[in-house]
């Protein structure tokens, strides 16, 4: 099993969610996060004063999938989240040793569905 973590632009969340649904992903975790990379920050005006906003709002999606579905999920996220501009985000893939469905006690890949 693999955990896929994707950091994407907030306005792309719905597109990514629909793309994942189209490849059979039934659930995911979404967290509002802030960060910076090559995109750096930007300046904003507030009450006549200029402020540097260094951390930009992003959305972090997390989903655990069977190994054989990994490529399909990564491709779906990549297609849906891409704008072609700096700041589109990143995808990280991590190994998952175990999954447990708390309600039933089911473990392994059975607990994912």
Regions found by a protein language model. Name each.
Residues 1-113:
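Positively charged, small/polar-rich N-terminal and surface patches that mediate targeting and assembly
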């Amino acid at each position: 099993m693999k955990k896929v973590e994707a950091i994407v632009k907030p306005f792309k969340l719905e597109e990514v969610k629909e793309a994942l649904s189209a490849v059979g992903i039934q659930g995911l975790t979404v967290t509002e996060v802030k960060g910076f990379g090559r995109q750096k920050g930007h300046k904003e005006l507030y009450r006549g004063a200029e402020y540097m906003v260094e951390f930009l709002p992003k959305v972090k999606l997390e989903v655990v999938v069977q190994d054989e579905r990994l490529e399909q999920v990564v491709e779906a996220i990549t297609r849906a989240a891409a704008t072609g501009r700096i700041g589109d985000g990143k995808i990280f893939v991590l190994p998952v040793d175990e999954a447990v469905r708390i309600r039933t006690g089911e473990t392994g890949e059975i607990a994912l569905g």
